[in-house]
Amino acid sequence: MLRTGDMHPDTLSRRTVAFVNIAHALDHFVLLIYPTAVIAIAAERGLDYGALIGLATGAFVAFGLFSLPMGWLSKRLGRRNLLAAFFGGCGVACLGISMTATETGFAVWLFMLGVFSAIYHPIGGAMLVTHARQLGRDLGWNGVWGNLGAASASGVTAVVAATLGWQAAFAVPGLVCLAVGAAFLALVPEDGEGNAQRKGSAGVIPVSRPMVLMGIFALAIIAGGMTFNVTTISLPKVIDERLGLALPLALTGSLATVVFVFGALMQLAMGRMVDRFSLPSIFVGISILQPMGLGLAAMTTGVPMLAGLVMAMAAIYGQVVVNDAMVARYVPAEHRATAFSVRYFLGFTTSGFAVPLIALLHGQGGFAVVLAATAAFGAAIFLCSISFLMVAQPRLNAGNVAAE
């Protein structure tokens, strides 16, 4: 086994960032297998979509709830060890889902998948900021990896489920998680100190009213958690019902993948902008696209609906980069793991209600109602961004600026 002393810090940082990026892709991939596979499961077993999708509620609640203690655990167990547990736990949970035959089994294993998936964002986010060479660029590329995981989940799951069965759609990613985890343990010996003081690392931005600013940001995170999860979870079924074409499952999943790809492109753009422009101004510009895109998707079908989803998904995933940059730029280094834990706890725990909300609203009026409600959450984010811009005035005393 390698030791930190045997490895140049640059090598350790490059390897750490590489595995953090892969973990981000796998995190979003494994959580979004079920929303596509459930279409095949429902058809095979003759069960209602609303009832089956509701079994994933525990996974998404756990995804947020168990992110909260990760900052505390990282100080005791180490970030590297927790990320290794992420790889192993997600792999075992996916294999468990592939072998279950009951609705209770689905609920239990999906819950376990949510527990281990909760490790990534607070731990991976803190590791990325620590080892990043250029914050905005590395956050942008990390976002792309996560988005590609989400994007490929729909298409890959649809193809595998249609050709090999839905069980294989869980088993194959489970084995991949275990293999990547073994490689991570072998190639990344410890946490390391990273690139915290190197070129491209920005200092913490001092503000005059930090508590008010964080309160506004918290509200935006909660609303953003709803738009993110409702949209990503329901996307394959939205396309299936509202595109206006009778498409096979594989093609439906592929179209969902195309929509996610636009989100990845926006994340690259956001990464570049974070290194060049004011974060509050970027926040306003990206957030207005969410209610616009979701509103268009709610009011239309066919190609216009697809265009609205593209706009919304680009904004939703671009917002993720902005949010992570906010934590990196407004929170001191020693508190970042805890800050990332709270950030994802707020976003993902609240959005754990996304699954029952989808089921409830879909039963009341289809996806037009689901998308309209999501657009309302998007409008709330835009209002928060305006408030954030007004409050985020730096302190006048430059001597108080802290370095990361």
Language-model segments: which ranges?
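Structural signature of the two symmetry-related core transmembrane helices
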Residues: 81-95, 281-296
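Helix-loop-helix hairpin linking two adjacent transmembrane segments in secondary transporters
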Residues: 142-189
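A late C-terminal transmembrane helix in Major Facilitator Superfamily
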Residues: 330, 334-365
